[in-house]
Design a protein with these regions (language model features):
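Glycine-rich, flexible N-terminal cofactor/catalytic loop recognition
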Residues: 1-64
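A contiguous loop/helix-start segment that scaffolds small-molecule binding in enzyme catalytic cores
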Residues: 2-6, 84-85, 164-234
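Class I SAM-dependent methyltransferase SAM-binding "motif I" and its flanking Rossmann-like core
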Residues: 6, 103-161
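Short glycine-rich anion-binding loops that position phosphate/pyrophosphate groups of nucleotides
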Residues: 12-14, 91-95, 175-176
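Short active-site oxyanion
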Residues: 29-35, 112-116, 168-169
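Alpha-helix capping/helix-boundary segments
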Residues: 41-43, 93, 123, 177
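Conserved helicase motor
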Residues: 62-69, 144-148
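Glycine/small-residue-rich loop that forms an oxyanion/phosphate-binding "nest" at active or ligand-binding sites
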Residues: 65, 73-115
Length: 234
C-alpha cells in the first residue's frame, strides 16, 4: 500500500463491519500503526471490530477534536513525513466531513502529502439518497441554535433557501431533543414543505420517511435518543 494519510470510515452504530465497509478497508487498516482519532476509546473498539486479533498496544493514537491546537495537529503528521502511513478515524461515519478530521487533511494537503479517502457510510449522503430531495445541491448545517427564538429564525432561513435556491437543507439535534426539533419544524415551516426524518441509518430499526409538514402533524415518530438527520425541501 502507498504511504498516505488514509481517511477511514467507521460504522454509524452497532452494525457489522462487513455490512457497510469493503474488505479493502481492513487490508489498509492492518497496515497502519498510527491513528489520528476523535475518541481513543471508540477508535480502539472499532479496530477490534475490524480484526479481533489486532494488537492495540502496538498502535499509537493521537487525539483530535475541535479544541486541539493547530500546531499539535500539525505535529501528528510527523510519522507520515517520515514514511509511515496514518489513519484518521471519526467517532461515526466518514472522517473530515462535518468532523475535526478536516483540519489534519487541510494541513496534509498544504504539505503536499498523499491523502486517500476510503469508502464507507456517511449519514449525510445516505439521508439525501433516501429522502427523494435534490441531491445536486444540498447543505449540511450541523446543530441549530438551542435558544428557541434563534432556532425558529434559523429554521425559517433554511426553509427560505429551499424555495429560493432549490437546495436541500440538512441539520441535526442532540438525540434527546429530537422530538422538540420535530415540533419546531412542524410549527414553523409551511404545510407544503417536505420533511424527511432519517434515523438510525444503516442500523437496526433504521427509519427514513419523507412527508409534508401537514402530513407529519400529529403523527411524529418516536425517535427520542436516536441519532437522526432532518432534511427539508420543497
Amino acid at each position: 500500500m502507498d504511504t498516505a494519510l488514509y481517511l477511514l470510515p467507521v460504522t454509524l452504530g452497532d452494525t457489522d463491519v462487513e455490512q457497510v465497509l469493503p474488505a479493502y478497508n481492513k487490508e489498509i487498516i492492518l497496515g497502519i500503526k498510527h491513528f489520528i482519532v476523535e475518541d481513543v476509546r471508540s477508535a480502539r473498539r472499532f479496530l477490534k471490530k475490524v480484526e479481533r486479533s489486532i494488537d492495540i498496544d502496538e498502535l499509537t493514537f493521537y487525539p483530535l477534536n475541535k479544541h486541539t491546537p493547530h500546531e499539535v495537529v500539525a505535529s501528528y503528521l510527523e510519522p507520515l513525513i517520515n514514511g509511515h502511513s496514518i489513519g484518521v478515524i471519526s467517532e461515526a461515519g466518514c472522517p473530515a466531513v462535518a468532523d475535526p478530521g478536516a483540519d489534519v487533511v487541510a494541513i496534509a494537503q498544504r504539505k503536499n502529502l498523499k491523502v486517500v479517502p476510503l469508502v464507507g457510510p456517511s449519514s449525510i449522503i445516505l439521508s439525501v439518497m433516501g429522502s427523494g430531495f435534490n441531491g445536486q445541491s444540498f447543505a449540511f448545517h450541523g446543530y441549530l441554535p438551542i435558544e428557541p427564538s434563534e432556532r425558529i429564525k434559523r429554521i425559517k432561513e433554511l426553509e427560505s433557501r429551499i424555495y429560493t435556491e432549490h437546495q436541500t437543507q440538512l441539520f441535526i439535534e442532540t438525540p434527546y431533543r429530537n422530538h422538540k426539533m420535530m415540533e419546531d419544524i412542524i410549527k414553523t415551516c409551511r404545510p407544503t414543505t417536505k420533511l424527511c426524518i432519517a434515523a438510525n441509518i444503516t442500523c437496526e430499526g433504521e427509519y427514513i420517511k419523507t412527508k409534508t409538514v401537514k402530513e407529519w402533524k400529529g403523527k411524529l415518530p418516536d425517535i427520542n435518543k436516536i441519532p437522526c438527520i432532518f432534511l427539508i425541501y420543497k
